[in-house]
Amino acid sequence: MKIKTKENTKLVARWSIFLLFWMMIATVAQSSEVNQTALQNMIRDSKARAAMVEHVREAVVHIRVEKSLNGAGSNLQNPSNQNNPGARQFKQQGLGSGSIVSKDGYILTNNHVVGDSDRIVVRLHDGQEFEAELIGADPPSDIAVIKIAADELHPIQMGNSDEVKVGETVIAIGNPFGLTQTVTLGIISAKGRSNVGITDYENFIQTDAAINPGNSGGPLINLEGKLIGVNTAIFSKNGGYQGIGFSVPVNMAQIIMQDLIAEGKVSRGWLGVGIQDVTAELAQAFGVKNTKGSLITKVMPSSPAETAGLIKGDIVIRVNQRKVKNSSQLRNYIAEAGAWADVTLEVIREGKTEIIKVTLDELKSASTSTPLKTQSSLVLGILVQDLSPDVVKRLGYDPGTGVVITEVESGSPAAQVGLKAGMVIAE
């Protein structure tokens, strides 16, 4: 009996080893099959992405601009002076990108690419070149529209920038350093970036897709091949790519583009209030639960805000059912609504929520017939000038008090704390 027990034990051990061996083989085979499936999926996705990019590239253009510069000084005289035989003229050249947005030749790009240029030349993906006409440019948003007379154009599809998510894969296409039709891949790093100090109206999509000089005006697209942003600027200490790029959301760019095509300029809404972000201290003082919204610090006399009944201390938390996270967002919403638009504001007043309807006015840029004294602050990184009589009256300030910021240096202390061109420093 003991001998049989030993033989049975050996037999069980042999079968156990045999079964374990085949289980290991089956596991390895299954793992290999899974890896092959994953690899095939990656290859399929890669080919699909390449096909999509190839299609979208037909809508991306290379832009070359020229601007005449008159020489100044003893050796560089004004060329318009016919009595000067040594008159000389210089041409400044620049490069950028753009997206074809219609079959009849409209192209969306940046103001800093084509604004104030004497000549604009557009090169299509197939190498054809066309002289372009500047339809309109909007420096406050850095958006511009040009047009070419060409046939068989392939416009880009418009996406919805409000729907994109942080972490979503995106692709940038453009002409960095003149290298045409360059494609880079990245993700959306952040949405709603403001207080960057690049433009007056900021609501940027931030991406780590490589963007370099020459990419400006080109498209940022999603994996469906739809335009979600206009590549505009980079954050860099050396002028090159450092992983932080900014694009104007297509929803914002489209509103501006439509105004430029229809009127040649942008008509923005004006509420007539001074605003600031709600800090933790202010939230506690006003008895609100969080720092979302925009605090009204001043109501301009005879403004739409005053007419509608807004008062100092109101906290605006929604505009037409859209949540307001900060003052920059409120400013953008009011501007986008346009002149004479009826908007519904949801505000917190003394701890209670109120609904206020406002008919906006048109935001007018400050103008004056005589040059104003300009001052600069190298420490803060701002350029300011005295208030014109028109601005003093419109903003409700006393004559001779305050200055208006005309320029903010990117990355300066002023930019970091949120100062922007157009703001008034009263004290």
Can you annotate each of these PLM segments?
Residues 23-25, 299, 408:
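Processing junctions and N-termini across compartments
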Residues 31-344, 348-390, 400-401, 410:
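Serine-dependent protease modules
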